[in-house]
Regions:
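Bacterial N-terminal signal peptides that target proteins for export
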Residues: 1-8
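Pyridoxal 5′-phosphate
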Residues: 10-13
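C-terminal motif of bacterial Sec signal peptides marking the signal peptidase cleavage site
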Residues: 16-19
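Periplasmic peptidoglycan-binding/tethering modules of Gram-negative envelope proteins
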Residues: 21-98, 172
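Extracytoplasmic/secreted proteins, especially bacterial periplasmic and envelope-associated proteins
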Residues: 79-86, 112, 116, 120-124, ...
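A non-catalytic structural micro-motif
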Residues: 95-104, 119-150, 163-172
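Short beta-alpha junctions and helix-cap segments that line functional grooves
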Residues: 151-155
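A generic structural micro-feature
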Residues: 157-161
Length: 172
């Protein structure tokens, strides 16, 4: 196969993947009771990433919408386990809610590898949500690989911000 054919085939596959993706809608804000004013700041976790049962009841932990990963890893960090339990509880309590898990990677590695890594990261978050009682029918995993960086500098600090899954609540 010559280079031109390979390039055309890769472009065709990318076009097909983009054409098959769903349009993501922005989620409505988290519901709060009418007589309760929204909190101005997130309460400090009691230990590294842990929330108290009261936090789970007030949805304070739902503010964690970005899950970060280590370099070239798709394993969920322990500090995000409580956030997974909180989001799963939200999904259980609201069966009509839907969530898109947007997997991302830093710029290191090939485009194809990073697309796969972003998908594996999204699937890891999906599995954690399901293990905590979330329904697979409420979850949609999308991988953007290295295509949607939040930081464009070439530094470890910046790359760490790009190795993530973003949780987006979507309309039904």
């Amino acid at each position: 196969m010559n280079n031109t054919t390979r390039i055309l085939l890769a472009a065709l596959m990318c076009t097909a993947a983009v054409a098959c993706s769903k349009k993501v809608k922005e989620a409505p804000p988290v519901e709060t009771p009418v007589n309760q004013a929204p909190a101005a700041t997130e309460p400090a976790p009691t230990t590294a990433g842990a929330y108290t049962p009261a936090d789970l009841d007030t949805d304070a932990c739902l503010r964690t919408r970005v899950i970060y990963f280590d370099f070239d890893q798709d394993a969920l960090r322990p500090e995000f386990q409580q956030a997974m339990a909180c989001h799963a509880k939200y999904l259980r309590d609201r069966p009509s809610s839907r969530m898109t898990l947007e997997g991302n990677a830093d710029e290191r590695g090939s485009r194809e590898y990073n697309m796969g890594l972003g998908e594996r990261r999204g699937n890891a978050v999906s599995s954690a949500l399901q293990a905590n009682g979330g329904s697979a029918s409420q979850l949609n995993v999308v991988s953007y690989g290295e295509e949607r960086p939040t930081c464009t500098e070439s530094s470890e600090d910046c790359w760490g911000k790009n190795r993530r899954v973003e949780i987006v609540y979507t309309a039904k």
